[in-house]
């Protein structure tokens, strides 16, 4: 999440980095009341490796 935030800050302040609108919406407008913040990995075949950081599997995606 911290990395995504830093990428978005860089993308907003730079004219050379182009982030698609859907990417901005996904990173900046998460619905924390429904699921949580995405941890950046799926848990379709293996458990969340980011469980040590507090992530858990919900709907085949790791969330905090």
Curated annotation (Swiss-Prot):
Disulfide bridge positions per record: 39-55, 43-57, 48-62
Disulfide bond among keywords: yes
PROSITE patterns: CYCLOTIDE, CYCLOTIDE_BRACELET
Record keywords, A-Z: Antibiotic, Antimicrobial, Cytolysis, Disulfide bond, Hemolysis, Knottin, Plant defense
Keyword Secreted listed: no
Residues making up the propeptide: 1-35
Organism from which the protein derives: Chassalia chartacea (Chassalia curviflora)
Domain notes: The presence of a 'disulfide through disulfide knot' structurally defines this protein as a knottin.
One GO BP annotation of this record: killing of cells of another organism
Protein name per the record: Chassatide C7
Protein family (similarity comment): Belongs to the cyclotide family. Bracelet subfamily.
Tissues expressed in: Expressed in fruit, pedicel, root and stem but not in leaf (at protein level).
Domain of life: Eukaryota
């Amino acid at each position: 999440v911290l990395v995504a935030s830093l990428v978005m800050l860089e993308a907003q302040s730079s004219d050379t980095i182009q982030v698609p609108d859907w990417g901005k919406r996904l990173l900046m407008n998460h619905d924390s009341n429904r699921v949580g913040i995405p941890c950046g990995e799926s848990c379709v075949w293996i458990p969340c490796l980011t469980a040590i950081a507090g992530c858990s599997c919900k709907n085949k995606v790791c969330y905090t």
